Amino acid sequence: MAKKVLIVEDNELNLRLFRDLLEAHGAEVRTIRDAREALEAIRGFLPQLVIMDIQLPHISGVELIRMMKDDPLLDAIPVMAVTAYAGKGDEGRVRQAGADAYVSKPISVSRFVTAVEGLAGPLGGGFKQAG
């Protein structure tokens, strides 16, 4: 059975890249661009993994992770933080908020898929070529 993954990312290019990679590996993917809608979407979908940008408008990814971890329905869902801003101390701050993995952009495809499967388990179908 395919793993369910929800992506919270405001950048359309990154969103499509992550979605296409995950779907090509057999995952069932939902996407959210607005962090203000994320908690409701996560509750409705109950994914095995949430992949989240940290630099989001309106609500930061760090704050959104904290909100998830404070919610008894969502606190056990692993979170993989993805960010272009990988400064000193950022990983510690993100992990302290409750992220289970931290990947900096630009992503390495193999590192990304390995991190996803490390948190969610095998995605459910192996690599599927488009066509």
Language model: regions and residue ranges:
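C-terminal output helix
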Residues: 13, 107-116
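Conserved acidic carboxylate
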Residues: 9
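Active-site beta3 strand of CheY-like receiver
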Residues: 45-51, 56
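Charged docking surfaces used in two-component/phosphorelay signaling
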Residues: 16-24
